[in-house]
Amino acid sequence: MKKADIGLVGLAVMGENLVMNMESKGFTVAVYNRTVEKVDAFTGGRAAGKNIVGTHSLEELAAALERPRKVFLMVKAGAAVDGMIEKLLGVLEPGDVIIDGGNSHFPDTIRRTKLVEEKGLLYVGTGVSGGEEGALKGPSMMPGGSPAAWPVVKPIFQAICAKVEDGSPCCDWVGENGAGHFVKMVHNGIEYGDMQLICESYQLMRDLLGMTDAEMHEVFAGWNKTELDSYLIEITRDILAHEDADGSPLVEKILDTAGQKGTGKWTGIESLEEGIPLTLIAEAVYSRSLSAVKEERVAASKVLSGPAVSFDGDREQMLADLEKALFASKIVSYAQGYSLLRSAAKTHGWKLRFGDIALMWRGGCIIRSVFLGDIKKAFDKDPELQNLMLDDYFKDQLETAQAGWRRVIAAAVMNGIPVPAMAAALSYFDGYRSERLPANLLQAQRDYFGAHNYERVDRPRGEFFHTNWTGEGGSTSASTYNA
């Protein structure tokens, strides 16, 4: 019997769909699940008659695979991955490849790569984006780990991943150890930002402009034919047209509390570790946290007053402004995300190809959009681009959008409608383009209470000074206390 090209462990929906995807591309797949009944149900059901081999133990799985053996883990991130790696190390041999396709935290992937390589095996931590449908029809894939593993898994990965219009695969090698899962983490953070920006646009249409769901559906349908063309705009269009059993808009029946799995939080924490302002994505995470305290908000709505919502302007002009505000804010979100990627690449020694990452996100994933092609062009033109907003195309788009962007946020503020992500985006834009910020006063405060020193505008950078602000503190500066 022909040996299988690859094995997969974990037959939840994502795992099953990846198996079906691989088999449809001509690969024979061996499968294993901790509860073996799941294996039999799968091979006797939707996998019946296909080149899919069921196994009831990891030993049987390993024996069914051609060398070098490749085992794709689709198990819950965390301890389950560590446990499965430990078991696989007992049945695999040097040169074999273990692949983790879950949403693992990148420090875990760095640790696991080292562990597996020390045993003589190879390790791949790959981000997989696109949900259940993407897994079946072609996801975006972001692999990192042991560089020697890439030639081994590349034929399978690039066969099953999504493709863009010219046939280019939405999968390429990202970098060593945890690079792939780091890029997937930032992808998810940007996803949080995109979703929040769309929700703020929806709230402004509904609460400020008094639009019906049918009218908003038409607006999003129109936007999906512009530079905002994207998967998330597309599904928002469809959601707004979906009716409940009684014929009313279903979305208005859904409780306004949003969940999260933690990848957005990881992105925000990592931005703090790297010292990179990721303000929009952080606000998107906090907005979900605020939505979760529904009972508190209901109580507060009866106590805390705000302005009466009133709009007597030109609705079409406001919608045009809102389109520009959404696009400009989206540019800022990606600019911040790419700044984090650039900083982390230096910290971890990853040689990230930023334009290629944009291409990986062009198809198959949740943030796929036409816009990503412009990011690819920006980094192809200048691989050392410091900030996406400085690219000629994006600079021009921000300048065109700026007046409408400001009008939208001003209208939201005056009417008491929260737009935390859009407002954070504009504040970042204004801060980034400011030659002078009030941090001189902040540093003076730090020197006053903590003797933390400061630099002077009339002296070379790197030369530090301390002032005895009270006449009692002396001339000693701080070395251990920091604030």
Regions flagged by a language model, labelled:
Residues M1-R69, L92-G95, G131-A135:
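NAD(P)+-binding Rossmann beta1-loop-alpha1 motif at the extreme N-terminus of oxidoreductases
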